[in-house]
Amino acid sequence: MAKEIILGIDLGTTNSVVSIIENKKPVVLENFNGKRTTPSVVAFKNGEIQVGEIAKRQLETNPDTIASIKRLMGTTKTVKANGKTYKPEEISAMILSHLKEYAEKKVGKKLTKAVITVPAYFDNSQREATKIAGKIAGLDVLRIINEPTAAALSFGLDKKEKEMKVLVYDLGGGTFDVSVLELENGTFEVLSTSGDNHLGGDDWDHVIVEWLTKEIKNRYDFDPSKDKMVMTRLKEAAEKAKIDLSAQMVAQITLPFLSVTSKGPINVDLELKRSEFEKMTTHLVDRTRKPIEDALREAKIKASDLSEVLLVGGSTRIPAVQSMVEHVLGKKPNRSINPDEVVAIGAAIQGGVLAGDINDVLLLDVTPLTLGIETLGGVATPLIPRNTTIPVTKSQVFSTAADNQSEVTISVVQGERPMASDNKQLGQFNLSGIEPAPRGVPQIEVSFSIDVNGITTVKAKDLKTNKEQEITIKNSSKLSDEEVEKMVKEAEENREADKAKKEKVEVIVRAESLISQLEKSLVDQGDKVDAKAKEETQKQIQELKDLIKDDKIEELKVKLEQIEQAAQAFAQYSAQQAATENSKDSDTVEAEIVDDKAN
């Protein structure tokens, strides 16, 4: 295993995945349920924070359940649950804490460092928000890397000697990216990236939900949109139908007792054909065409120059998506990678590079959007064009717009529009103390620096007086350092409380499982057990039940150890008795061996 384990995390809209480097090879870790993907869902129940599959199952019944929080990262929007208001970073931190916890259990040690992936088209605020979420979860986020880049890293790790150009088409649950990379001698250079931060598998689900709502209205004279719980069931059914239609031509949608009206219960039984589904979602598939064309154009290559086309993200399993990609690029996509896991694996590889476990790999990523400042007339003047390789620093000299101007305001913008007001303002600051002079005379140097995580720092310097001012562009949700520290502290406190609750639940579940096993054994094998052993087992079952009822967890742990040993002996005895009965009618070798042990 690595000298220093750095987690590779794909923090997805729908699902999240964790990977590490083990013996110089990436390994995807299983969660507490033995699954390799974890739903990015958080639920609050009885004062406990629940994450993953257990939370997803509550989407239908628990209003304090939050999904698809990634869509709100980097915004000022909040969500309400559990009687409180949460920022997106806090909810994402709960997901990251859960991933960190099960990773620590798997490797048997505390883990504090991570590489986290984000959509290539995430802006500065969204990247900063992701780092803050990691910090709240107790993680030092060493790198933020783009999801398509991570996928290419994973695909190309064993092809370092080859020279190839790869297009990565990444359609996740809530975001869409296309990146073109060049792989040569272990260097992974991103040539271009394009995409849509508001397009993903959720949108395909939404189309089916709209269809279901309309069909139910027409066929059953019932409007499901007026019932939140019913709509949650429709969303779950829509996701299942979408998945089914990736493998079969018809999806059967059955929703028994969807609701009850004056006419009686509503039992929905509908059929959705793949051809109908494809017709309904043509506009969504078509929205992914232009980013493909843009990425190729900006990389200055033709589709015929591509060595490989990689499909990443669970939504790329949709047949219409695969057909469109093949049609537009004239090349069959490579299906050798797992679209759900490849991004986390790439993040782990980058972690392995940082830890020194993987050598001869260099990642050169790009900034997805143009960065610049607002100049006279509200014009957005670019300093760093989109698809510039990072890390990078660029400078340009500007001047004053009025005579004797003693102060200038630097407004930093991100986007491709010519006017500053049409782009996203990332922040602003003032440079004061400029010596009086006619307009156009003072020389003010503005420098932009983008680090390996895509985080931007802007400096302004008066070249005559050497006075300077700088700003590191922070998350647009404007979380102060104090707020972040408070969240870190709260998360740590909750982590201990949640851990205690979780351990308590695990002990109770273990005890209830044992009770069930013992009671079943008494029913199945009771007539073959002597009265004393049977009475002792019944007594132990009652003791377990009493300890659970009285909430005596520590005593329950001790009693469990004792009874589990007794249960094992009971099971062996039952097996021996059963074998003895069988031996009366059989001369098999196996029976003779059991008889020998019994004597």
From Swiss-Prot:
Induction or repression: By stress conditions e.g. heat shock.
Organism: Mycoplasmopsis pulmonis (strain UAB CTIP) (Mycoplasma pulmonis)
PANTHER family: HEAT SHOCK PROTEIN 70KDA (PTHR19375)
GO-annotated molecular function: ATP binding; ATP-dependent protein folding chaperone; unfolded protein binding
Stored SUPFAM superfamilies: Actin-like ATPase domain, Heat shock protein 70kD (HSP70), C-terminal subdomain, Heat shock protein 70kD (HSP70), peptide-binding domain
Protein name (database record): Chaperone protein DnaK
Function: Acts as a chaperone.
Family the UniProt entry places it in: Belongs to the heat shock protein 70 family.
Region annotation (Disordered) ranges: 575-599
Modified residues (Phosphothreonine): 187
Top-level taxonomic group: Bacteria
Alphabetic keyword roster: ATP-binding, Chaperone, Nucleotide-binding, Phosphoprotein, Stress response
Family annotation (InterPro entries): ATPase_NBD, Chaperone_DnaK, Heat_shock_70_CS, HSP70_C_sf, HSP70_peptide-bd_sf, Hsp_70_fam
Pfam family, any one: HSP70
